[in-house]
Amino acid sequence: LNLSNKKALVYDLGLFTENALRLLRDCASVEYYVPTREAFPAPYKVEIGSGLDGLERVDSFEEHLDRADFIFVPDTQCAAMVEWLRGHGYPVAGAGAAERLELDRWHGRTRQKENGLPVQETHRIKGVTALRKFCADRKDFYIKVDNNFRGISESFKHQDLRASESRIDYIAHKAGPYKEDVVFVCEELLPGVEPGLDGITWEGELLYPTTIGYESKGSGIISRVYGSERELPEAARLIDEGLAPEFKRHKTRFFYSAEFKIDKDRVPYLIDSTIRLAAPGVAAIQSELIENYTEVVYGLATGEKTAPVMKHKYALAISMDSSEASKTFVNITFPKEMRRWVKLRMAVRHRGDYYSVPPFDSLASVISLGESVREVVETAKERIAQVEAINLNIDFAGIEKLQEEIQEGKRYGINF
């Protein structure tokens, strides 16, 4: 498929600049929009993507709609817009209404149960007062902030009230007068390993090849390619089948990820649904592992089903952070020939140099492709050694632990 005369328009919230840039490898142009409507806009979001290797940063989304051959919306919080665009005949690739499975966790758990997936013990708690009581009475739960307050706190493990109280105090402070309106989804802590299915759904049909990955937040992700349904571990197939009715109902054609826990009983429990590109590692890997990436995105937008092409068996993304990046622009340097393998997060290019955009401490992921776990790990380490930034933090120990988790997962039926 020749897309060299096509124009792409990307509506992003700032995290998927590299995926927008990947389209430029095959398209005539890529216009990149990040919403910045604020009374007193800071220079940060206004600059994301500017000067970045041919990407054209635009200040208006609506003015460019009718010039685009297809539209790409990689993130969530955009369901109404994506559905409106579809309803008005625009070719758009985005999660749409199905994103509620991710954003409304209680809804997601409810649909999961209705679709026949096993469900761990789960409680819906409203307000910090009720949460304190729950935490005083219960131990060993994973607590997630739900509804419109997700941004005020990361999910956290609750073992006893003494350990969790400071986090609850923090949430109460951040929520202010709304502290009794915050909804929490409290889920039983489960034993076992936590792989994730990272795929593309076509209205409930999982497109092959697809991948499963083991991820450690702040460290990275190791992924393995599966060429067919027969090759895919049964646990991952069951998870996909449990989500498929939702994708079919919403006519979802997009990327998604589903993390699940599995132990020696080999029963998969869905932990998190990500109905968008999964950041940072999965999206970074997909942009290079999928050789016909632009064709796939174009097909998702236009209704032309296009199977992804993957010529490698394994992939790895290692995360790079810097404490300085949350405070100021951080210069990131690497050899020119490394550009394809360094996937920046919120970034700009100014006067020939690459910078991360504050206040986000995640700088980039360095990726590698290969035919064994050992190969992708060694290649990624060689590449990371060539990247420089102030206060650069890389968790190699986390990558080693992932390799141990892969071996454990094999005992539970996750062939890797």
Predicted regions and their residues:
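Hydrophobic anchor at the start of a short beta-strand
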Residues: 28-31, 92, 119-120, 141, ...
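Peripheral (often C-terminal) accessory segments that flank ATP-dependent C-N-forming ligase machineries
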Residues: 297-416
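Short glycine-rich anion-binding loops that position phosphate/pyrophosphate groups of nucleotides
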Residues: 16, 76-78, 146-148, 276, ...
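ATP-binding N-terminal substructure of ATP-dependent carboxylate-amine bond-forming enzymes
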Residues: 1-97
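A conserved helix-loop-beta module that forms one wall/lid of the active-site cleft
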Residues: 94-177, 183, 321
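Active-site "cap" helix and flanking loop/linker of ATP-utilizing ligase/carboxylase catalytic domains
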Residues: 235-257, 274-339
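Internal nucleotide-binding/catalytic subdomain
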Residues: 154-278
